Design a protein with these regions (language model features):
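The tetratricopeptide repeat
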Residues: 4, 37, 70, 101, ...
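Alpha-helical positions within canonical tetratricopeptide repeat
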Residues: 19-20, 49, 53, 66-69, ...
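Catalytic glycan-binding domains that act on GlcNAc-containing polysaccharides
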Residues: 30-32, 39, 54-61, 201, ...
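Solenoid-like repeat scaffolds
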Residues: 22-32, 43-46, 55-65, 76-79, ...
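Residue at a conserved register position within TPR or TPR-like alpha-solenoid repeats
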Residues: 12, 45, 78, 109, ...
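Structural register within alpha-helical repeat arrays
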Residues: 8, 38-41, 74, 105, ...
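Structural motif corresponding to the intra-repeat A-B loop/turn of tetratricopeptide repeats
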Residues: 15, 44, 48, 77, ...
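N-terminal leader/linker segments that initiate helical-solenoid repeat arrays
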Residues: 1-40, 369-389, 398
């Protein structure tokens, strides 16, 4: 059949077996087929003249998968026979991916005598790419007017922050002895190599304030559990940080430790000085400062300024609802009900998020309004590109090339940014019977405020949920696997409910069912029966408390028991459940509990009023 021949053709092309591909009989013309074969061919192509074909393909198909591999392939084919102007033109559109390509760019700039761009290219290579001993020596010798001792140190500093041992040591001949001592101390601390004290002693006093050394000492102490000793280093940290994310990870660990010790004043001081400027870590740091000020230092006014500033600078529904809900709580605690109500109303607009839903309750509303499906927007730019990827995915599924089809749909999802672009992806995913890819696309769209409720919250038939509420099962499955029955995590958790084989085996034994590991990913009912049974045992253990059972499903009951001991039991009146969730020490579990609970609110709404899911 055509399908089998097409399947064979793609298999040969994936392997780069062009002789067998040429020998295929009856390979009828098909537009999708020809384009996929061309794409696969260009990825493997080693002939010089295919450079132009790759450049054309990239220009005409901006959203195709594995764009970077195609760019790297083109870089390989940029031969010295090409005119320098062509080479420079290429790199002005595609920054070099490999060290070798970077050298080709530099050579072309030399030939055309473009000194300004040459200097930029040399510095960018020097500061961002892994180089051999020979390449380093060559650059230092040839470009010593640009690669000054200070620039040489900047490269070593970058390699040390990355933790690259060999590449750092390759730089030793080019730096001073004192800088070598500093580098050695940083590497020893970073990789827990031992003999750190003598290594630090060898660093001269004027270099001991080096950001990287302070950071590695701080992190080393925290890893060794020396939290008090680590804290001494926080008070004279540089105001400008090169790698703010790394600093925040350590600072957050210290703040959480202080909260555990009920040392709220110091925790607040450390949180206030977080120095984050943007992105996810800014949102987390700014929120933490506000929350500690409000809940543990009784400073509602100060807290509200943190939350309002956070609201202005974050973009995702999860962060905006979190900032506005807590701003409402801060104004409420400061006896300013009208302003508090205003902020709860802002938060409640984000009705698919945990804090948006809590704000809705704060406003005394029992009904939960889900976002309406948007009308088709005018921003349809790029929709034809996306539709093409979807049609190719459908074609690939029909000929039995599912893995490749998934790659095309996921790439389409990552590039889609409007309703008109996301809509065909969801239809395509449902058409090829991969609802988990529709969930994937719909969830990505929701971050941009584009909602597809029924695709985002599927309700497949469930046979046996062991008396556990269906809405809860769906909520866990959505967070665990996005409804992908074949999901497998890097830790080895399997299937819809992401069961660890050992857990699944003991549950099967208690239910007197035969245990079959393969069935965890091949039979979704089997996976749900075991997962629901395990979940039910957790709900019983925690006397009906969903938040505790959900936390235990993610982090294990031994951790939840530890947290109950430490922070109290949120099922009792004197312990605030929201604070309890926010005090969970593991970021992954905090996020997990909030995401499952927000799913639960939506699923209950969809199950009780099926019409709202249109």
């Amino acid at each position: 059949s055509h399908s089998q021949i097409y399947n064979k053709a793609i298999t040969f092309a994936e392997r780069g077996d062009w002789i067998k591909l040429k020998g295929l009989k009856h390979l009828n013309k098909n537009t999708h087929m020809e384009k996929v074969l061309l794409w696969l061919k260009l990825r493997h192509s080693t002939t010089r003249d295919s450079f132009g074909s790759i450049a054309r393909f990239l220009k005409q198909n901006p959203y195709w998968p594995e764009r970077n591999q195609l760019i790297q392939q083109a870089e390989l084919l940029l031969s010295s026979k090409r005119s320098p102007t062509n080479v420079i033109n290429w790199f002005s559109k595609h920054s070099p991916k490999t060290t070798e390509a970077h050298f080709k760019w530099i050579k072309a700039l030399e030939v055309t005598n473009d000194k300004e761009n040459l200097d930029k290219a040399v510095l960018s290579l020097w500061k961002t790419k892994i180089l051999s001993q020979r390449q380093q020596r060559f650059l230092i010798k040839k470009y010593k007017r640009i690669i000054t001792p200070e620039i040489i140190w900047q490269r070593l500093d970058w390699l040390l922050w990355k933790g690259y041992i060999r590449s750092s040591q390759r730089m030793y001949p080019h730096v001073t002895q004192n800088q070598r001592h500093l580098a050695e101390a940083r590497l020893r601390l970073r990789h827990l190599m031992g003999a750190v004290d003598p290594a630090i002693k060898r660093v001269p006093l004027e270099l001991r304030k080096d950001d990287g050394l302070v950071f590695e000492r701080l992190r080393w102490r925290q890893r060794k559990g020396m939290m008090e000793k680590a804290r001494e280093l926080y008070w004279n940290i540089p105001g400008e940080q090169k790698y703010p994310r790394l600093w925040w990870r350590e600072r957050a660990r210290q703040i959480r430790y202080l909260l555990k010790q009920n040392n709220f004043d110091t925790a607040l001081l450390l949180a206030q000085r977080h120095l984050q400027k943007e992105g996810r870590y800014y949102a987390e740091a700014q929120w933490l400062a506000g929350w500690i000020a409000l809940r543990y230092a009784d400073k509602p006014e100060q807290a509200s300024t943190y939350f309002l500033e956070m609201y202005d600078r974050v973009r995702t529904p999860v962060s905006r609802s979190r900032a506005s809900y807590w701003a409402g709580r801060a104004f409420e605690q400061n006896n300013n009900s009208p302003i508090a109500k205003k902020w709860f109303e802002v938060a409640a607009r984000y009705s698919t998020t945990f804090y948006g839903q809590l704000a809705n309750k704060k406003l005394g509303k029992t009904e939960h309004r889900l976002p309406k499906k948007q009308s088709n927007d005018s921003k349809a730019d790029g929709a034809p590109y996306i539709s093409e990827l979807v049609n190719i995915a459908i074609f690939l599924t029909e000929i039995g090339k599912t893995d490749l089809a998934i790659k095309f749909l996921k790439t389409a999802s990552r590039n889609a940014s409007s309703y008109a672009q996301v809509s065909p992806i969801i239809s395509g995913a449902l058409k090829i019977n991969k609802p988990h890819l529709a969930v994937y696309a719909a969830r990505r769209a929701a971050r941009k405020g584009i909602y597809f409720i029924s695709a985002s919250y599927p309700k497949p038939a469930l046979n046996d949920t062991r008396q556990v509420e269906k809405a809860l099962i769906y909520s866990i499955v959505r967070q665990e696997s996005n409804f992908d029955p074949q999901a497998e995590s890097y830790k080895g958790a399997l299937g819809l409910m992401q069961l660890m084989p050992a857990t699944a085996k003991s549950v099967a034994k208690s239910l007197r069912l035969n245990f079959n590991q393969e069935k965890l990913t091949s039979d979704h009912n089997y996976n749900i029966t075991l997962g629901a049974s395990y979940l039910r045992s957790l709900i019983e253990k925690y006397e009906g408390s969903y938040p505790l059972a959900i936390a235990a499903y993610n982090a294990g009951p031994h951790n939840v028991d530890k947290w109950i001991k430490r922070f109290g039991n949120p099922t009792q009146n004197d312990v605030d459940l929201i604070d309890w969730i926010e005090r969970i020490p593991y970021g992954e579990t905090r996020n997990y509990v909030q995401r499952v609970l927000e799913n639960l609110t939506i699923y209950r709404e969809l199950i009780s009023k099926p019409t709202t899911s249109k």
